[in-house]
Swiss-Prot record:
Residues 1-16, 102-132, 191-206, 299-330 are cytoplasmic. Disruption phenotype: Death by 12.5 dpc. At 10.5 dpc, embryos are smaller and fail to undergo axial rotation observed at 8.5 dpc in wild-types and present dilated hearts and open neural tubes. Plays a key role in early steps of protein N-linked glycosylation by being involved in the conversion of polyprenol into dolichol. Acts as a polyprenal reductase that mediates the reduction of polyprenal into dolichal in a NADP-dependent mechanism. Dolichols are required for the synthesis of dolichol-linked monosaccharides and the oligosaccharide precursor used for N-glycosylation. Also able to convert testosterone (T) into 5-alpha-dihydrotestosterone (DHT). It is a multi-pass membrane protein. Its EC number is 1.3.1.94, 1.3.1.22. One of its GO terms (molecular function) is polyprenal reductase activity. The gene is Srd5a3. It comes from Mus musculus. It is found in: Endoplasmic reticulum membrane. This is Polyprenal reductase. InterPro entries: 3-oxo-5_a-steroid_4-DH_C, Dfg10/SRD5A3. Residues 38-80, 154-169, 228-277 are lumenal. One of its GO terms (biological process) is polyprenol catabolic process. Its main location: endoplasmic reticulum. GO terms for cellular component: endoplasmic reticulum; endoplasmic reticulum membrane.
Amino acid sequence: MAGWAGFELSALNPLRTLWLALAAAFLFALLLQLAPARLLPSCALFQDLLRYGKTKQSGSRRPAVCRAFDVPKRYFSHFYVISVVWNGSLLWLLSQSLFLGAPFPNWLSALLRTLGATQFQALEMESKASRMPAAELALSAFLVLVFLWVHSLRRLFECFYVSVFSNAAIHVVQYCFGLVYYVLVGLTVLSQVPMDDKNVYVLGKNLLIQARWFHILGMVMFFWSSAHQYKCHVILSNLRRNKKGVVIHCQHRIPFGDWFEYVSSANYLAELMIYISMAVTFGLHNLTWWLVVTYVFSSQALSAFFNHKFYRSTFVSYPKHRKAFLPFLF
């Protein structure tokens, strides 16, 4: 009974509950969109909170009260500025702790304890044999935090030097959520590091010898997925540029090439694969991170559904074999 009680307590920590709630909310919203039209909520605000960019423009004329809360879609770059700074800081603190034995600041330890207290275990209760998985988990969290920072840095670069933003908008609620999102993701990664009070279990000198097959596979998958996402964003950008790379319009065109041959939102599919690569890096059995992946799947699938609907209603010649998000399936 004590074992089950401990499992239930760890399974219901605030962090997992939050990601589960977000995943369930977006999955429910997706199922509503797939339901018959008569079952869809008629509230304009509900639809406005779900859509952004071109899918927001493609609907019927939006009420003035909705337009009053518009934020330019180009403000996406703000999300990645915050992520680079915040998650870069978390990566620095984790590196200091792993390689120099420096404790986390009091405020960070308190925050992590609040979000996921199950990571704090008494060292005296751990046998020498059981510290090996803890060391592997520490390496996993370190690598995933590196991946998250690299991903954010690349996306920030793309916002400034690759993407061509139109005058499309996002809702201010979506904007505020985006500002908080990468802060929460970084804390989620850090909360998986095995710790005793403020000190990380494993020092860096023993960290690299903990590398396992899933660390290597996760790294390969991450860079493979990132390369495809970058290529997809270049394809989308080139639709608005001439052969010299000069922006000539901000209209929408049908993308071709790479994963766009299979799905309408290839960049969203790549985003999902990036998060799955992080789940692999965690050893495929980290429940908290799989809840994050479930949220990413639900939110990206919803956006992909709207994109697919936009393309099919806008372009008569749109390829009929393409799916919205998952090749050959959805």
